[in-house]
Amino acid sequence: MNKDKQFIKSFFIRMLILLAAVIAVVVIFDPFYHYHKPLPGLKAVLTDKEYQCIGTLRTFDYDSLIVGSSVCENYNNHWFDEGFDCTTIKAIRSYGATADLSYLLDAAYESHDLEYAFYNIDPSSLSASTEPTFESTGCPMYLYDNNIFNDYAYLLNKDVLLEKLPYMLANSFIGDYDEGDSYNWAQWKYFGRDMALGMYARLPSVRDMQPETVNSVELVGNIALLEAQVEEHPETTFKFFFSPYSMLWWDNAYRSGELDAVIYNEKQAIGALLEYDNVEIYYYQDDKDVITNLDNYMDMIHFSKDINYYIYDKLAKGEERLTKENYEARLDGMYILARKIVQEEIPKYYGK
């Protein structure tokens, strides 16, 4: 009997020691950067934005952010560091919804003062829900909340211990992993006309054009979220920009009956944001040479890293900036270009 008790006691002691060792290893190396920035000698290996982004915003050293959806993942942070004399990391959410990006900005501002926010506005973000979607889309909320009692899901996670941690260590010591390429997905992707056309599920018929105010409720809410960030942080220069989606996206906007609303939403958002002294807005959607060259794209939205650099370079030079005097004309020009694309460019691939 005593031997049985001794065995059970010994077993539990060993289990506790093992669990403590596992927890210690995860806390010390912390591949999701939940507790601290990388240890000296280790690189910030960032490949899982849903798991790592929130931690980096709380624990890394930086003074500027690249904020946006998946089209921002292929920027190299070092470009912005050199071009704007700052230290940059990314605040990325695949969907790019305003509420989600505002959540990430709030997390950053809890412990950091930001000099710049390089913020990509996706058209869809202006008509998206004004409630954060992290929980509803299955993100690991134990990494997002401040409840240490549910951290066991991270600390005692087999995948973290046997996959994520070794991957981080391997990339720190082997190969030429570039920390500036955080969350970059372009390396193994193919960009070209055939790929872009193949990924485009074109609507078989043209729907009736929706009223331009169809998303008014969501639009007002999303503009308010953007204005709140700008108003609450006058020390930050917000450099908002609109990225060049391909002509296939504009064709889809027309065929789905959303084109009028897209332009209206952008006009309303831009007009509101231009009222603030700490806001600059840059517009790259209407670059015809880029958006009509499908070799730049892998689908109707996502462009190659060359286009990311092209946008960065224009931002750094202050090119294509919108003002109160010119923004309506630029957006009207985009509307005309979109209709021209439908009438002249798209028929080259799909016929009349």
Language-model regions: role of each:
Residues 71-151:
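Membrane-embedded segments
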Residues 120-121, 130, 134-232, 328-352:
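Secreted/periplasmic serine-hydrolase-like ester/acetyl group-modifying domain
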Residues 194-276:
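Conserved, well-ordered alpha-helix/loop/beta-strand core segments that scaffold catalytic motifs
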Residues 12-31:
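Hydrophobic membrane-insertion alpha-helices, especially the h-region
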Residues 61-63, 86, 113-116, 233-238, ...:
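Loop/turn elements at helix/coil->beta-strand transitions in domains of secreted/extracellular proteins
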Residues 267-352:
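C-terminal regions of proteins
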Residues 74-75, 125-130, 246-251, 290-293:
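Short catalytic/ligand-binding loop motif for oxyanion handling, primarily in non-cytosolic enzymes
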Residues 29-90, 96-107:
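Membrane/wall-proximal cationic-aromatic binding patches
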